[in-house]
């Protein structure tokens, strides 16, 4: 499913409108974790990350893991510095009012699978 369709279906708020190309990315896999070493080891390239972490290291990890997007659950919002870094690195950022469990469940219902599905 296209990232822009996921954002629309989940009612996500986009924080990085300057990132181009990702909205058309076909998202097949996702990962949820707040432990960044776990994300580095297991998140699927081209996928989405669902997390509560909102600091700069999330962007570094997302970029290194070649993630298309990060969804911040529970209405958690990074500051402007984090959004600026994401724009520079080409990582799309979104916010959901739903908690992590609900975001992941809705992603799965839309056809986004985990690494072992």
Name each region found by the language model.
Residues 1-22:
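N-terminal, charge-rich interaction modules
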Residues 23-24, 33-48, 52-117:
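Feature captures the catalytic cores and cofactor-binding loops of soluble hydro-lyases/lyases
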């Amino acid at each position: 499913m296209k990232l822009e369709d996921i954002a629309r279906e989940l009612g996500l708020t986009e924080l990085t409108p300057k990132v181009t190309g990702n909205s058309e990315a076909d998202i097949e896999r996702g990962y949820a974790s707040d432990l960044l070493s776990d994300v580095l080891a297991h998140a699927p390239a081209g996928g989405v990350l669902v997390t509560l972490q909102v600091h700069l290291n999330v962007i570094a990890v997302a970029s290194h893991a070649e993630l298309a997007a990060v969804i911040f659950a529970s209405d958690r919002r990074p500051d402007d510095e984090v959004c600026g870094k994401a724009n520079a690195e080409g990582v799309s950022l979104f916010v959901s009012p739903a908690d992590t469990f609900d975001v992941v469940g809705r992603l799965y219902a839309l056809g986004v699978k985990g690494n072992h599905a």
